[in-house]
Amino acid sequence: LIFGISAAMAFVQRAFLTMEPIIISRAGGSEALGAIALSIYLGAQSVGMVTGGLLADRMDRRTLLVRLCFLALPAHLAAIWLGPTGVLGITATACAGFLGLATLPPIVVMAQELMPSSTAVSSGIVMGLAWATGSLGVLGTGALADRVGPFAAALLSMPVILVALGLALHPELGRPARPATGA
């Protein structure tokens, strides 16, 4: 479950980072505007990461994940729809970045709780392996963009957040790990 949430969110973030500059360029925007959009998104991600960590230490992590995933979908859709022009578009881009990476601290801690004797391995699985898996999906977004254009492909990719949300709502998520029974 945790792996799936991490992979889905990684896909969404990488699809945004890949498509947004292309969308801006195709709409007649400058490369500088594309760079500004990515800088806003990535800068907000760093704030989201720290905030997500603070919140994960202070509240139920499953509830936090559900809320972050729930809010991340409209934020990403608005960021793509509005683009980084105007206050509303810049705010949407920042919110999308913030919410997207704020999911990572609770994901990592929950993975570590599932494998308390292998915390480094669990972190590597939900970061490295899940991120690589999610990144592979961007190939599909690119192929879709060749058919329907980057704007539509980006918008159609964002509902993958619903997969993360569904997994975060799964009743097994957040239950304490059962101790291994040895012989």
List each model region and its residues.
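Intrinsic disorder in cytosolic terminal tails and internal cytosolic loops
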Residues: 170-183
